[in-house]
UniProtKB/Swiss-Prot annotation:
Protein name, per record: Kelch-like protein 12
Gene that encodes it: KLHL12
Biological classification of the source: Eukaryota, Metazoa, Chordata, Craniata, Vertebrata
Organism: Homo sapiens (Human)
Gene Ontology cellular-component annotations: centriolar satellite; COPII vesicle coat; COPII-coated ER to Golgi transport vesicle; Cul3-RING ubiquitin ligase complex; cytoplasm; cytosol; intracellular membrane-bounded organelle
Subunit structure: Component of the BCR(KLHL12) E3 ubiquitin ligase complex, at least composed of CUL3 and KLHL12 and RBX1. This complex interacts with DVL3 upon activation of the Wnt signaling pathway by WNT3A. Interacts with DRD4, KLHL2 and SEC31A. Interacts with PEF1 and PDCD6/ALG-2; interaction takes place in response to cytosolic calcium increase and leads to bridge together the BCR(KLHL12) complex and SEC31 (SEC31A or SEC31B).
Gene3D superfamilies (alphabetical): 1.25.40.420, Kelch-type beta propeller, Potassium Channel Kv1.1, Chain A
UniProt note on tissues of expression: Ubiquitously expressed. Highly expressed in testis and at lower levels in the submandibular salivary gland.
Kelch repeats: 282-329, 331-379, 380-426, 427-473, 475-520, 522-567
Protein task: Substrate-specific adapter of a BCR (BTB-CUL3-RBX1) E3 ubiquitin ligase complex that acts as a negative regulator of Wnt signaling pathway and ER-Golgi transport. The BCR(KLHL12) complex is involved in ER-Golgi transport by regulating the size of COPII coats, thereby playing a key role in collagen export, which is required for embryonic stem (ES) cells division: BCR(KLHL12) acts by mediating monoubiquitination of SEC31 (SEC31A or SEC31B).
Subcellular location(s) per record: Cytoplasmic vesicle, COPII-coated vesicle
C-alpha cells in the first residue's frame, strides 16, 4: 500500500460483550474460577476479578484484610440461592429478570451486594407497577432500602390518586403518623375536602377502640372551612364520632364560623383555609359557533394557575354542536355539525405527543350526532342522544379506545338533543334537552350493570343547551334555553337524596354553554345570551354560593366542546 497512513485508534462495539460472554461460559464450566459463593448450601463458582469489578461489596471483601480475602469459599447470608443465581447472571451478562414474584427479594439483595444496576432495574420495575392499591407499600419499601427516586415517585403517585388510594387496605393499615403525613400534604389532588374527611373517618372506624382518640389530631389536617355548608350540616354534623368529641366539635364550629361570618375570614386565614395545590389542570375549549356566523376550528387552553390563555393546533374539521371529553391524557372531539351535515367523525388530541399535541382521527360513531351528550366512565366514552339532521335520537353508544371501536347500548326513554350527560357514583345521568316538540326538564339515569334507563326527579326548569357538571356530590345544571328565555339560573341535583335545589344564578344568561369543574370550582364557559355570542367565563364557588367572571377567551363562541385535561 502506497502513501503515508496515519495511525488510528479503532474501538469495536462487540469487544466488551464478547468478553462477558466468554467469562460467563468459563463460570458455567467452572473454568479458572477462584472463589465459590455458598448460599443456602448451594455453591456458585465465580471469578473474584469479575465480582470485584461489578460490586463494591465484593471489591472490599477481596482487596481488604477481611477474613474472606483468601478463602476459596465465601458464605453469603441474607439472600436465597435463587436470588443469588439471578444476581450472578446479571454480573456476567448485564441482564436481570425482574418480576412481581422476585422483586421484593431481589432489591434488598442488590442493596446488600451493592449491585447498582440491579437496584436501578428493580426500582424502574416497581415504578412501572405503581397502582392505588400498592403505592403506599412501595413507598415504604423504597424508603427502607434508600431508593430515593422510587420513594418520591410513589409519594407523588399517592398524592395524585388520593381518592382511589384511600379506598385500599394499605391506607387503612397506616399508622396515625403516616395518615397525618399524607392528609396534611398540600399536593394531594382532590376536587374538595370531602374525600379527605371520609378517609379519616374510615381509617378510625377500622379499629374504633384503638383509633378513636386519634380523630381530633387527624381532623385538624382536614380543611373543613373549604367544605360546603350543606356537607358540614348533612354529613359532618351527623357523624357520631364528631358529636362525641369536644375537640372535633370545635373544629366543626370553626368551619361554620368561616361560612356564617364572612367579615371574619381575613382573620381566620391559616392552613385549614388554604386550598390544596391540586393537579395542574387546564381547561380546553374546542370548536363551536363563532362570530363569523359559522362553525369554527379554534382550540384555546386556559391555565388557572397563570390565568393565561393560549392557542393549540386547530381541529382538522370545523364543528359546532360538538361534544368533548378527556380520557387518559387525550381529548376527544365528537360529532357536531360542519355547516353542511351532522357528523359521526371523532378527532383525538394526544396532548403528550409533543408540546402542542397532535390531532388524529379515530373510529367514527355508528350514528351522526350534533348536540349529543358525552361523558366518560372507567376507560370508556359514552355518547347519547343528539340530532342527525332528520330526527332526535334515544340511542347511546360507547367507545373503547383500546380497540378503537364503538358499540350500541340501551336506548333512553326520551329522544333528546341539547341534553347534558354526566357520571355520578358510577351511574350516567342525562338531563333536559329538546325532543323535537318540547324542551324538557326530565332526567333519566343509566345503570351500566343492568343496561337500563330509569327516570329520576325532574329539574325545576325546562332546559336545552345547558351546561352540566358534577361537583362534590351534586350535579349542577347551568343556563340553557327554556323555550322563551335564555337562562342564567342554576340548579343542583343531590344524588344522595334525589332532590333539586336552586343556587345563585350566573351573572349572565348563557345558552349552548359549556360547563366543567376545575380545581374544586364550577366553570361556565362562553355561550349565547340571546343577543350576542360570549367569550367570558364565570366561576362558581360552592362554599360561598357565588359566581364571578374570571376571564375571557380570545374567541366569542357557543356550541363549543369543553373539558379539563390534567397536565403532566
Amino acid at each position: 500500500m502506497g502513501g503515508i497512513m496515519a495511525p488510528k485508534d479503532i474501538m469495536t462495539n462487540t469487544h466488551a460483550k464478547s468478553i462477558l460472554n466468554s467469562m460467563n461460559s468459563l463460570r458455567k464450566s467452572n473454568t479458572l474460577c477462584d472463589v465459590t459463593l455458598r448460599v443456602e448450601q448451594k455453591d456458585f463458582p465465580a471469578h473474584r476479578i469479575v465480582l470485584a469489578a461489578c460490586s463494591d461489596y465484593f471489591c472490599a471483601m477481596f482487596t481488604s484484610e477481611l477474613s474472606e480475602k483468601g478463602k476459596p469459599y465465601v458464605d453469603i447470608q441474607g439472600l436465597t440461592a435463587s436470588t443469588m443465581e439471578i444476581l450472578l447472571d446479571f454480573v456476567y451478562t448485564e441482564t436481570v429478570h425482574v418480576t412481581v414474584e422476585n422483586v421484593q427479594e431481589l432489591l434488598p439483595a442488590a442493596c446488600l451486594l451493592q449491585l447498582k444496576g440491579v437496584k436501578q432495574a428493580c426500582c424502574e420495575f416497581l415504578e412501572s407497577q405503581l397502582d392505588p392499591s400498592n403505592c403506599l407499600g412501595i413507598r415504604d419499601f423504597a424508603e427502607t432500602h434508600n431508593c430515593v427516586d422510587l420513594m418520591q415517585a410513589a409519594e407523588v403517585f399517592s398524592q395524585k390518586h388520593f381518592p382511589e388510594v384511600v379506598q385500599h387496605e394499605e391506607f387503612i393499615l397506616l399508622s396515625q403518623g403516616e395518615v397525618e403525613k399524607l392528609i396534611k400534604c398540600d399536593e394531594i389532588q382532590v376536587d374538595s375536602e370531602e374525600p379527605v374527611f371520609e378517609a379519616v373517618i374510615n381509617w378510625v372506624k377500622h379499629a374504633k377502640k384503638e383509633r378513636e382518640e386519634s380523630l381530633p389530631n387527624l381532623l385538624q389536617y382536614v380543611r373543613m372551612p373549604l367544605l360546603t355548608p350543606r356537607y358540614i350540616t348533612d354529613v359532618i354534623d351527623a357523624e357520631p364520632f364528631i358529636r362525641c368529641s369536644l375537640q372535633c366539635r370545635d373544629l366543626v364550629d370553626e368551619a361554620k364560623k368561616f361560612h356564617l361570618r364572612p367579615e371574619l375570614r381575613s382573620q381566620m386565614q391559616g392552613p385549614r383555609t388554604r386550598a390544596r395545590l391540586g393537579a395542574n389542570e387546564v381547561l380546553l375549549v374546542v370548536g363551536g359557533f363563532g362570530s363569523q356566523q359559522s362553525p369554527i376550528d379554534v382550540v384555546e387552553k386556559y391555565d388557572p394557575k397563570t390565568q393565561e390563555w393560549s392557542f393549540l393546533p386547530s381541529i382538522t374539521r370545523k364543528r359546532r354542536y360538538v361534544a368533548s371529553v378527556s380520557l387518559h391524557d387525550r381529548i376527544y372531539v365528537i360529532g357536531g355539525y360542519d355547516g353542511r351535515s351532522r357528523l359521526s367523525s371523532v378527532e383525538c388530541l394526544d396532548y403528550t405527543a409533543d408540546e402542542d399535541g397532535v390531532w388524529y382521527s379515530v373510529a367514527p360513531m355508528n350514528v351522526r350526532r350534533g348536540l349529543a351528550g358525552a361523558t366518560t366512565l372507567g376507560d370508556m366514552i359514552y355518547v347519547s342522544g343528539g340530532f342527525d339532521g332528520s330526527r332526535r335520537h334515544t340511542s347511546m353508544e360507547r367507545y373503547d379506545p383500546n380497540i378503537d371501536q364503538w358499540s350500541m347500548l340501551g336506548d333512553m326513554q326520551t329522544a333528546r338533543e341539547g341534553a347534558g350527560l354526566v357520571v355520578a357514583s358510577g351511574v350516567i345521568y342525562c338531563l333536559g334537552g329538546y325532543d323535537g316538540l318540547n324542551i324538557l326538564n326530565s332526567v333519566e339515569k343509566y345503570d351500566p350493570h343492568t343496561g337500563h334507563w330509569t327516570n329520576v326527579t325532574p329539574m325545576a326548569t325546562k332546559r336545552s343547551g345547558a351546561g352540566v357538571a358534577l361537583l362534590n356530590d351534586h350535579i349542577y345544571v347551568v343556563g340553557g334555553f327554556d323555550g322563551t328565555a335564555h337562562l342564567s339560573s342554576v340548579e343542583a341535583y343531590n344524588i344522595r337524596t334525589d332532590s333539586w335545589t336552586t343556587v345563585t344564578s350566573m351573572t349572565t344568561p348563557r345558552c349552548y354553554v359549556g360547563a366543567t369543574v376545575l380545581r374544586g370550582r364550577l366553570y361556565a364557559i362562553a355561550g349565547y345570551d340571546g343577543n350576542s355570542l360570549l367569550s367570558s367565563i364565570e366561576c362558581y364557588d360552592p362554599i360561598i354560593d357565588s359566581w364571578e367572571v374570571v376571564t375571557s377567551m380570545g374567541t366569542q363562541r357557543c356550541d363549543a366542546g369543553v373539558c379539563v385535561l390534567r397536565e403532566k
